[in-house]
Amino acid sequence: FEYYPPKTEGGVSALVHKRLPSMAKQRPLYIDMTWGAGGSTSDLTLELCRQAKELYGLEANMHLTCTNMEVEKITKGLEGARAAGIRNIVALRGDPPAGEEKWQAVEGGFTCALDLVTHIRKEHGDYFCLSVAGYPEGHPTVIKDVAPGQQLTPAEQKRVVYSTDEDGGEKLQVCFDADYANEIAYLKKKVDAGADLIITQMFFDVEVLLQFVRDCRAAGIAVPIIPGIMMISTYAGFKRMLGFCKTRVPPTIAAEIEALKDDKKGLTEY
């Protein structure tokens, strides 16, 4: 289960005293807690991970990102994790800060998750279990528009994302084969640098995930791959995440969700 640090005291209390103990009954392998750009939630993220572990025996997997993070901040975050008894880190580049479209490294900071994994292994050896992100459909930044009449390979056809343009017409996007191969090669570099497992971006097409796993294994990536599954709570949230992640939704599933868009209870149960 993945959690975002709440923005209010009431939200924090509800998470610690209601949601975490309720979720703990499901006996998850771990819970992970996100990390705000520039360490904006660092203290709260650390405290929530500590409480999840101490109060409910949950294995905490703490996000750590490169966004607006000087090396000194990353060092402080890792030291805080060790002090709190947290031994699991999700090493990520991170998304651009709110209001910005393009990701940029801070001066003297890391440029990617590979840099972060390499740094953690160099400074902390095998103390931390490191997770990294994997993208079965390709990272959103390399999922590109398909030109009208452009031919796609069989592999690309299975990854193609259907959406609508500003005029309501059909729009096709895909991570082309060359970019997809680069994605797999980069993922292997992260694993070779010391990542212990891969957590995937959310997906709705199981065949896309299975092909991703096959491609990883063929590339020599042998670490466990944990599927990332989005729990749909609202139609608006579902559509927002589709746009943000550029996720493929099989037509049958898309039609079923569309039919439930005004039925909150039915959508949650779905």
Ranges and model annotations:
Residues 1-36:
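N-terminal beta1-alpha1-beta2 module of alpha/beta enzyme domains
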Residues 1-6, 29-33, 60-64, 89-91, ...:
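Hydrophobic faces of well-ordered beta-strands that scaffold small-molecule active sites
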Residues 10, 108-178, 183-184, 214, ...:
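Active-site pocket-lining/capping segments in soluble small-molecule metabolic enzymes
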Residues 10-14, 39-51, 70-76, 96-123, ...:
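Active-site-adjacent beta->alpha loops and helix N-cap segments on the catalytic face
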Residues 20-27, 46-57, 78-86, 121-125, ...:
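Acidic (Asp/Glu)-rich catalytic clusters
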Residues 25-67:
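Active-site cofactor/substrate anionic-group-binding motifs, chiefly glycine-
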Residues 30-41, 64-65, 89-92, 177-179, ...:
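Catalytic beta/alpha-barrel core
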Residues 64-66, 70-97:
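A generic, well-ordered mixed alpha/beta core segment in the N-terminal half of proteins
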